[in-house]
Each structure stands twice: as C-alpha cells, then as structure tokens.
C-alpha cells in the first residue's frame, strides 16, 4: 500500500507527505522497490510524517514512493 512520498531528507530524519491516513506512530515504512530504506514514524501532522531512518540514508532521493 502506497503511503506517500519523501519530501525532505536531513541526516537520519526523513519527512514523508502522506496520501493515506492509516499511518500510526511506531509504524515501519519502506521505499517501494528498495526495502533497504526503512523508517520508523515518530511524529505525524495533518499531511506529513516525520520518520527516523533505521539504516543509512545514503542514496535516498526526494520524491521516492513510500509504502
């Protein structure tokens, strides 16, 4: 299920604009077709989620689809 897209990356913090409201704090998200990029949701606002990367963010790009 597609959750949204990455809108910013700062060190290990990743901001995701949400397409779905089914996301909860503590959920683990990953980049579609790249399971090595996984994040834990730590904060949710009306339209976005702030996540902390569980691995390196090297090679991660803005606009990547998150599921």
Question: Which residue stretches match the model-derived regions?
Answer:
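Acidic-enriched and Gly/Ser
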Residues: 1-10, 15-67
